Regions:
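A sensor for short, sequence-defined functional sites
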Residues: 23-616
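Bacterial N-terminal signal peptides
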Residues: 8-20
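Positively charged n-region of N-terminal signal peptides that target proteins for export
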Residues: 1-5
C-alpha cells in the first residue's frame, strides 16, 4: 500500500547525474551467504490440513550476512497452526556444534498486529543463533502443523528462492491420491518419487541460474522470475468460490442505521458508494496483515465496526455490509498489493495477497485501506491490475489512468548579496490531492516548522520559511504556499551559473529522474501517467546582469511531451516547463524505455541547465 506522502513530489528535490547511473544486466545474486540446503516437505491430508518439515543449512560467506541471518524469524498463526523448532545450531568449520537453547527461541508479535488484539495470533518465532562468524553454517530444522486449512479440502503454496547462491533447494508435496496438484514452475525440475499406497508425491528441485539485479521501479520478481506455485484448485473460479464461501457478511441494525445516516441525503448511487467507502477509510484503522497470513475469513462486519480496525478483508466486509444496507451490491476483488501484475497459472495466495471492493453497477473499484487515498481513486499499487471477483468467479481489471495533475508557481526576488525571498504556490489535482492533505495532517508540528529549511538544505541552501495549506476547494484540490528566504541562492559577484529551477522541489525533476534511475533496462517497470506544469520567475536587482539563459526545449514521443521555455523580461528570467507522460498502461517494457531514452537524456540535460549572472 502506498503510504509515503505525496508531499515528496511537491516539496522534496531529487538530484542525479545521468552518467553515474546504475547499469542493467548486473548479477543480482547476494554472495554474502550460500543456501547449501533447503528441503521443504509438505504432507497434506484430504481436508487440507498439512504438516511442513523444513531442513535448511546456510553458509555465512561474508561479515554482512551475520546481521541479516543470525536471527531467523519464522512466522505462523497460532489460531491455524503450531510451530516447533526441532533442531537449531551454529556449526563451526571444524565441525563443532553450538546449539540454540530454548532461551534463544523467542516469540515476537508481528509488527503490523502488535496494537490490534484481533490479529495477535500472527507471531514470529525468532531463532537466535549463537557465536556466528564467517565460515559458519546455520542449521535449522522446524515443523509447522496446520490443523485448520485456509480453504477446507484444498491446498496451495508458492515459493521463491532467495537471491543467494543455491546448492540444494527441494520442494516435496506428499498428497492424497485424490487431490491432484497443479503447478506453475519456473526453473524447477519436476519428478515423481515413490509414494505410499493412496498417496502421490510430487517433487521439484530448483535449477540454479543467473538472476539479474532487480532494477529500479521494476515489476515484481514474481512476474518474470524463478518460483514454484502449486494448487489443488481446478481453476480460479473454484478459488473465488472458496473465498466467497468464507466471506459472508451480515447487515446488523447498527450497520443499517449508519448506512442510512451517511447516505439518506445523497441523490446518486455513486455518491453513496463513495461516501461509505470514505467513512470506512477515515474511521477504520487498517492493520496491514496480508490475505493468507491472517487467514482468509474476515471478522464479522459488526465486530470490525465496534473495534474500529481491521485488515483488508475486514475493510471489505464492513464496506460490503454498509453498501448492502444502502441497496448497493458489491463483491470482494482479490488482487496483488505491490508491483506484481501477472497472475500465476494456478490459483495461489502468494500473489493474490490483498482484497478490495468492486461495485458492478457503477464499474467502480474502492480500496478503503489506504487512509491517504480518497474514494473514487485507487492507490498506485492496485492500478491496472487483473482482479478475481469472488462473487462471480470472473476476472476484472482496475483502471489504468486516474487524474494526476500538479502545477506550481515559484518566484524569487534576488538580493544584491545573492540571497533571495521566495514564494511557491503548488496545486495538486486528482488522486494525489488527498495524499498530500493526509501527509500534512500526519506531520508533527516540529517537522512542519522545519520543512522549508530541510527542502532548502537539500539544495545546499541556508534559509527558512513557512508552509501553509489552503482550505479545500469544491474540486478537492490541494493548494499549498511556501514563503521563505534563502541566504545563498546565487554565489555573487560571479560570473556564476545558477540552476534554472522551475519548482522548489520534486515535480518534473522527480518524474524525469525516476525514469533516469537506470541507464539500460531488461525488466518491465512501473510508469504512471501524470501531467505537471511549472513556472518560475527570478527577479534580479539592477546591479546583477543576466549574461545567458538556457535554450528552449521541445520534445515529444509516443509517451512523453516535454517543453521548457526561457525568457528574459527586463532584469528577470521567466521559466516555464511542462512534462506530460501518458499511456494506457502503468507498466513499460524495456523496448519502451529504449524508445524514451533520447527524450530522458534531453530532459535531464535541460533540468541541469543554468542561468549565468554577474554582479557589477
Amino acid at each position: 500500500m502506498l503510504k509515503k506522502s505525496y508531499l515528496v513530489a511537491v516539496l522534496l528535490p531529487v538530484a542525479m547525474n545521468w552518467c553515474a547511473l546504475a547499469h542493467a544486466f548486473t548479477d543480482g545474486t547476494d554472495h554474502s551467504a550460500t543456501l547449501e540446503k533447503v528441503e521443504q516437505t509438505f504432507v497434506v491430508q484430504m481436508d487440507g490440513s498439512n504438516r511442513l518439515d523444513v531442513d535448511s543449512v546456510l553458509l555465512i560467506n561474508e561479515e554482512r550476512a551475520i546481521k541479516a541471518s543470525a536471527q531467523r524469524p519464522v512466522s505462523y498463526n497460532r489460531s491455524l497452526e503450531t510451530l516447533d523448532v526441532i533442531e537449531a545450531y551454529t556449526q563451526k568449520p571444524d565441525g563443532r556444534k553450538v546449539m540454540v537453547d530454548a532461551a534463544h527461541i523467542k516469540e515476537q508479535q508481528e509488527q503490523a498486529s502488535a496494537q490490534a488484539p484481533m490479529f495477535q495470533d500472527s507471531v514470529n518465532k525468532v531463532i537466535i543463533f549463537p557465536e556466528v562468524a564467517v565460515g559458519d553454517r546455520l542449521v535449522l530444522r522446524y515443523q509447522r502443523n496446520r490443523f485448520t486449512p485456509l480453504f477446507p479440502g484444498q491446498f496451495e503454496d508458492i515459493t521463491v528462492p532467495e537471491f543467494h547462491p543455491v546448492g540444494q533447494f527441494t520442494l516435496i508435496y506428499d498428497m492424497p491420491e485424490g487431490m491432484p496438484l497443479q503447478a506453475d514452475a519456473r526453473n524447477f525440475k519436476a519428478s515423481l518419487p515413490a509414494a505410499a499406497p493412496g498417496r502421490k508425491v510430487y517433487r521439484w528441485d530448483y535449477v540454479p541460474a543467473d538472476r539479474a539485479r532487480i532494477e529500479a521501479s521494476a515489476v515484481s520478481y514474481l512476474d518474470y522470475g524463478h518460483y514454484l506455485a502449486v494448487s489443488t484448485f481446478t481453476d480460479f473460479k473454484a478459488f473465488a468460490q472458496a473465498y466467497q464461501a468464507r466471506a459472508k457478511v451480515e447487515v446488523t441494525a447498527p450497520i443499517r442505521e449508519l448506512a442510512q445516516r451517511l447516505t439518506a441525503h445523497l441523490p446518486t448511487t455513486r455518491e453513496k458508494a463513495l461516501t461509505l467507502s470514505d467513512w470506512v477509510r477515515e474511521n477504520i484503522r487498517y492493520v496491514a496483515v496480508y490475505v493468507g497470513a491472517g487467514g482468509v475469513v474476515p471478522h464479522a462486519a459488526q465486530t470490525v465496526l465496534d473495534n474500529r480496525y481491521g485488515d483488508c478483508k475486514d475493510h471489505v466486509a464492513l464496506l460490503e455490509a454498509l453498501l448492502t444496507a444502502a441497496g448497493i451490491k458489491s463483491t470482494p476483488a482479490l488482487i496483488n498489493l505491490g508491483n506484481a501484475y501477472v497472475f500465476p497459472k494456478v490459483p495461489a495466495l502468494g500473489v493474490l495477497n490483498h482484497v478490495i471492493t468492486y461495485v458492478p453497477s457503477l464499474d467502480l473499484y474502492l480500496d478503503s485501506t489506504d487512509p491517504s487515498i480518497a474514494a473514487g481513486y485507487l492507490p498506485l499499487a492496485v492500478l491496472n491490475k487483473r482482479v478475481l471477483l469472488t462473487a462471480t468467479g470472473e476476472f476484472g481489471r482496475t483502471p489504468a489512468i486516474q487524474l494526476n495533475k500538479v502545477s506550481s508557481d515559484l518566484q524569487f526576488k534576488v538580493k544584491g548579496d545573492g540571497g533571495a525571498d521566495f514564494t511557491n504556490v503548488a496545486t495538486v489535482q486528482g488522486w494525489a490531492s488527498e495524499v498530500s492533505r493526509y501527509g500534512v495532517k500526519s506531520m508533527k508540528p516540529a517537522d512542519r516548522d522545519l520543512l522549508v529549511e530541510k527542502v532548502l538544505g537539500a539544495y545546499g541552501q541556508r534559509g527558512s520559511g513557512t508552509f501553509e495549506v489552503r482550505p479545500s476547494n469544491a474540486n478537492g484540490d490541494f493548494v499549498s504556499t511556501v514563503d521563505g528566504r534563502t541566504e545563498n541562492l546565487v554565489n555573487l559577484p560571479g560570473p556564476v551559473g545558477m540552476v534554472a529551477l522551475s519548482s522548489l522541489a520534486g515535480g518534473i525533476s522527480q518524474n524525469v529522474y525516476s525514469f533516469a534511475m537506470e541507464k539500460e533496462r531488461s525488466q518491465r517497470f512501473v510508469c504512471i501517467s501524470n501531467d505537471t506544469v511549472e513556472k518560475s520567475r527570478f527577479e534580479f536587482p539592477p546591479e546583477v546582469s543576466v549574461l545567458a539563459i538556457p535554450k528552449q526545449v521541445r520534445l515529444q514521443d509516443a509517451n512523453v511531451e516535454y517543453s521548457a521555455q526561457y525568457a528574459q523580461e527586463g532584469n528577470a528570467v521567466v521559466i516555464e516547463r511542462h512534462f506530460k507522460f501518458s499511456r494506457p498502461d502503468v507498466v513499460c517494457s524495456p523496448e519502451d524505455f529504449a524508445a524514451m531514452k533520447p527524450a530522458i537524456e534531453a530532459m535531464v540535460r535541460d533540468l541541469q541547465s543554468q542561468i549565468i549572472v554577474q554582479a557589477s
